[in-house]
């Protein structure tokens, strides 16, 4: 199947899940929260907070880019820069959207359909999940550069999303919305980073010879 058609079908499937999720939000969110209550706290804490934290992702990518520079690994460098851009852009977009929508978090016990509009109250910034957005944006870039490990990369991103539900921070549709936002951000940036890899290599070699 051509990659373009696969992407279109993938996005269509995610959007259908989001449209269907109002009926599934409450029961599936409660199920995932029970996992968080019954499972080891460190495991879900790692998934819910640290693994998908944009700042840590950017720090790791910066170290990766630095190592790639010293080792003269241009594919690594292009991937790290593309991933950094994906995390930044998806993170900013998710913050803008969630503060404009004003959706309550599950722990408040309110309906996921109850929106209050623009707000700075963090209790009403549920949609979309910023952790899911940055994780799936980064996953899109990594999978684009390293397709053989795509299933494992996206599994890690999904683990972060489930952790956000298990912690009571998000509904299912928040995570799905964040995943779609992340993929729509990450894939174009991955494509751009891949295409500019040769140009980046030429510029850096010119810099070395100067």
Regions found by a protein language model. Give the residues of each.
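N-terminal transmembrane-helix/juxtamembrane module of multi-pass inner/ER membrane proteins
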Residues: 1-63, 98-119
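Membrane-embedded catalytic cores of phosphoryl/pyrophosphoryl-handling enzymes
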Residues: 2-9, 114-210
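Interfacial segments of alpha-helical transmembrane regions
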Residues: 7-8, 63-95
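Membrane-helix interface segments
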Residues: 39-40, 72-78, 107, 146-152
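Aromatic-anchored segments of alpha-helical transmembrane domains
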Residues: 16-23, 87-93, 157-169
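Active-site His/Glu-centered metal-binding helix of metallohydrolases
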Residues: 27, 96-97, 101, 133, ...
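Alpha-helical transmembrane segments in multi-pass membrane proteins
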Residues: 17, 82-86, 90, 94, ...
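Structural signal for the C-terminal ends of transmembrane alpha-helices
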Residues: 23, 63-74, 143-145, 188-194
